[in-house]
Amino acid sequence: MQDLKPPEAGAASGFERATLRQFNIFLENRVGRLAALLHALETVGQHVNAVSIEESADAALVRLICANPKTGRQCLLDAGFSFSESDVIAVGLPKQDDHPLIRITRALLSAELNIHYAFPMLRCKIGPAIILYVDDRTLAAQILIRKGFTIVGESDLMPE
């Protein structure tokens, strides 16, 4: 078995630390609720590093990642938002690679890992990156590092 390529400086060196904390916020499907959520985070100095919004008839599910999960969590609690948390991985997309998403999906397919959902990062020090929620984060990170990808850690998020 080949040795794992260590993550770049700043990227998390342990696979568990390489996961990012994602907040899954349930919003009523009403005008202004998203603005209220973003304003609450802004008032405590939290920048949104990644966001995905799924709408249904009565509610919206907002998935987001901020630079400081502890501060973000407390903000959501204080503002009365209903939310849950999950761990995801973020993978840097090399600028010199014409088809990084194809390489990522093929690498994970080779280990029979399912990607449940994905969305882009808005703010990341290393450049373009994608958030992945997969069956096994540790195995996915190991495989992607072997294939030359960088796993984004908390220190790679844009500052608060």
Predicted regions and their residues:
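A conserved regulatory-domain signal marking ACT and ACT-like small-molecule sensing domains
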Residues: M1-E160
